[in-house]
A protein has these predicted regions:
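Sec-dependent N-terminal signal peptides
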Residues: 9-20
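N-terminal secretory signal peptides that target proteins for export/translocation
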Residues: 1-10
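C-terminal motif of bacterial Sec signal peptides marking the signal peptidase cleavage site
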Residues: 24-27
Length: 108
C-alpha cells in the first residue's frame, strides 16, 4: 500500500484555500442591475398597483430603499409564499430583470 507524505498535501493547502475563497466570494456577489430598466419593469408589471408609485404608499409592504439582501429579494420575487404577491419564476423574469428591479428599488 502506498504511503503519502503529509508534507505534499500541506504544500497544496494554501492554493486550495485560495481557490475555495474565490469560489465563495464570487458566489455571494450581487449581480449588477440597471435602475432605469428596473423602473420600466416595475411599471410594466404593475408593481405600483400594490406597492404604490414610490414603493412606499400602497397596500403591500414597503419596497423602496430596500435594506434586504439581493438573495432575499430574489427569493421573494420568485416565490413570496403569499397568495397575493404573484410568483415570478425564471420563465417570467430573468435574473437580469431581478437585478434591475433590485437596483431600482435600492436607489429609491
Amino acid at each position: 500500500m502506498a504511503k503519502y507524505s503529509s508534507n505534499l498535501n500541506l504544500k497544496w493547502m494554501p492554493f486550495l484555500l485560495l481557490i475555495l475563497g474565490i469560489l465563495i466570494v464570487s458566489g455571494c456577489s450581487t449581480p449588477t442591475g440597471n435602475p432605469d430598466d428596473g423602473k420600466r419593469w416595475y411599471s410594466m408589471h404593475n408593481c405600483f398597483a400594490c406597492h404604490g408609485p414610490n414603493g412606499n404608499d400602497g397596500k403591500a409592504p414597503v419596497v423602496n430603499n430596500l435594506e434586504m439582501s439581493y438573495w432575499r429579494f430574489e427569493k421573494i420575487i420568485r416565490d413570496a409564499g403569499s397568495p397575493i404577491m404573484p410568483k415570478y419564476p425564471e420563465e417570467k423574469i430573468s435574473d437580469q430583470d431581478v437585478a434591475d428591479l433590485y437596483a431600482f428599488l435600492k436607489a429609491k
